[in-house]
UniProtKB/Swiss-Prot annotation:
Subunit relationships: Tetramer of two alpha and two beta subunits.
Compartments, record wording: Cytoplasm
Listed GO biological process terms: glycyl-tRNA aminoacylation
Official protein name in the record: Glycine--tRNA ligase alpha subunit
GO MF, one annotated term: ATP binding
InterPro entries per the UniProt record, alphabetical: aa-tRNA-synth_II/BPL/LPL, Gly-tRNA-synth_heterodimer, Gly-tRNA_ligase_asu
UniProt entry tagged with the keyword Nucleotide-binding: yes
PROSITE patterns, sorted: AA_TRNA_LIGASE_II_GLYAB
């Protein structure tokens, strides 16, 4: 399935490319997240000393970006392709350029530039040194070396690549409207477009995000998720005298952190959060993320008993 002829072909090509370079090809996380970085395969696995290589597609929701399906390239629900490699290899940029060749963008035939743009996620307490990758004047992906996640220093540093799949597909297919993208690579009566798959949902979720979401219920949902996250972390924490006992309930707690973040984004879209409240909500989500990150380091996956080479 050719990557320049269909949305699904683009995804399959990236899967094959990164699988050939040693990445575990994971599935999307089954939660409402604002970006692929929220997937625990990135947020949590970027912490601790254990090596990690993974790639996956992640449906992402940003309620404020909805335009009722009337904007040709702005969506409240879209797809990111995420690659996370720890420790970051010295040839990460070359690997990335190789992925562009795989999907039909030869860097020698196009104006490919890396524009410095350090990345930050306030709710995750994360930041990294980064670059946007521009191809012929259009941003197609983000290239980041994580320095801190969940307020915790990353050691070793992870390399992260994020492709905006719709934008990339529009570029390689040569279309100006996301809804005109060929989704399945067929033509005639069998052709399925991006609009046939997603336009109605985009219209309906825009109405929900901006007009219908129950704001009082959302405020309570945030409180509930916050309390549940902290209760789960407390229940799974090692006892005070158990120096070698690991944490037992990080992932369920992190799910509640993700829920709190999405509820915050919905309230923001509904316009019911003041400037001062906004900062308070961000700090509350960041606090949950920090607690989850600290707990993850007390697990096997987080490297609690891991010994690096030479130790």
């Amino acid at each position: 399935m050719h990557p320049t002829r269909s949305f699904q072909g683009l995804i399959l090509t990236l899967h094959n490319y990164w699988a050939e370079h040693g990445c575990a090809i994971l599935q999307p996380y089954d939660m409402e997240v604002g970006a692929g970085t929220f997937h625990p395969a990135t947020t949590l696995r970027s912490l601790g000393p254990k090596p990690w290589k993974a790639a996956y597609v992640q449906p992402s929701r940003r309620p404020k970006d909805g335009r009722y399906g009337e904007n040709p390239n702005r969506l409240q629900h879209y797809y990111q392709y995420q690659v996370i490699i720890k420790p970051s290899p010295p040839n990460l940029q070359d690997l990335y350029l190789g992925s562009l060749r795989a999907i039909g963008l030869d860097p020698t035939l196009h104006d490919v530039r890396f524009v410095e743009d350090d990345w930050e996620s306030p709710t995750l307490g994360a930041w990294g040194l980064g670059w946007e990758c521009w191809c012929d004047g259009m941003e197609v992906s983000q290239f980041t070396y994580f320095q801190q996640v969940c307020g915790i220093e990353c050691s070793p540093v992870s390399g992260e690549l994020t492709y905006g799949l719709e934008r990339l597909a529009m570029y390689v297919q040569g279309v100006d409207n996301v809804y005109d993208l060929n989704f399945n690579g067929l033509e005639g009566d069998e052709k399925v477009t991006y609009g046939e798959v997603f336009l109605q949902a985009e219209q309906e979720y825009s109405r929900y995000n901006f007009e219908m979401a129950n704001t009082e219920a959302l405020r309570q949902h945030f409180i509930d998720a916050e309390r549940e996250c902290e209760a789960i972390l407390k229940a799974g924490a090692p006892g005070p005298n158990a120096n070698h006992q690991m944490h037992k309930s990080v992932f369920p707690a992190y799910d509640q952190c993700i829920k709190a973040s999405h509820v915050f984004n919905l309230m923001d879209a509904r316009g019911v959060i003041s400037v001062t409240e906004r900062q308070s909500y961000i700090l509350r989500v960041r606090n949950l993320a920090r607690q989850c990150g600290e707990a993850f380091l007390l697990t096997d996956a987080g490297g609690f008993n891991f010994k690096r080479e030479g130790e």
